[in-house]
Regions:
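Structural signature of tandem alpha-helical TPR/SEL1-like repeats
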Residues: 62-67, 95-108, 130-139
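Structural marker of alpha-solenoid helical repeat scaffolds
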Residues: 78, 112, 145-149
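TPR alpha-solenoid repeat register
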Residues: 83-85, 119, 153
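Canonical tetratricopeptide repeat
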Residues: 86-87, 122, 156-160
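Alpha-helical segment of the N-proximal tetratricopeptide repeat
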Residues: 47-75
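Terminal, low-structured helical/coil segments at or just beyond the last alpha-helical repeat
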Residues: 41-50, 137-168
């Protein structure tokens, strides 16, 4: 049989554990409420990409560049930097490529959004195709500023510039 003292110690242990669990629960609730409140009241819900963007990206991923060009031209979202960038990319990658058209759309994307990372990278690669190393390096410098802590687009264009230089 347990003594009264042992029973009292077990009861105290039980109460201590119960208190610790309640404390953890309350701290968790408090943290969750703070996280919930940290979102601004005016934050709009995340927008879903327009159908033309989803379709064009799928065509590009499947390397169906002519199809992507048709989808993008049908959407005719000329005021969108993404639209101009993807159309430029598709024109550059299709066979045969339309490099003049691609440049026009990259320039339009950058006029709308001067720090559009995709357009800066792809336009830089187009500059290399056209043997314009200074132009590619200027776009690389702009991309460096747009990517404060580094980004894939900067790394990709930097690698393309280095490969270009090693071939010359």
């Amino acid at each position: 049989m347990s003594s009264t003292k042992e029973l009292q110690e077990e009861a105290n242990d039980f109460l201590t554990i119960g208190f610790q669990m309640k404390k953890r629960f309350l701290v968790t609730l408090l943290l969750l409420s703070v996280i919930g409140l940290s979102q601004a009241a005016d934050t709009a819900p995340a927008k879903q990409d327009p159908i033309w963007l989803t379709q064009a990206r799928a065509s590009i991923k499947a390397e169906k560049y002519d199809q992507a060009v048709q989808q993008l031209q049908a959407a005719n979202e000329t005021s969108s930097a993404d639209w101009n960038n993807l159309l430029g990319y598709s024109l550059r990658k299709k066979q045969p490529p339309d490099l003049v058209g691609a440049e026009k759309y990259y320039q339009a994307a950058l006029k709308i959004e001067p720090s559009h990372r995709g357009a800066l990278e792809y336009y830089g690669k187009l500059k290399l195709i056209n043997n314009d190393l200074p132009g590619a390096e200027a776009l690389l410098a702009r991309l460096d500023k747009a990517c404060t802590f580094g980004c894939e687009e900067y790394s990709d264009l930097k690698e393309a510039v280095q490969k270009y230089k090693s071939k010359k």
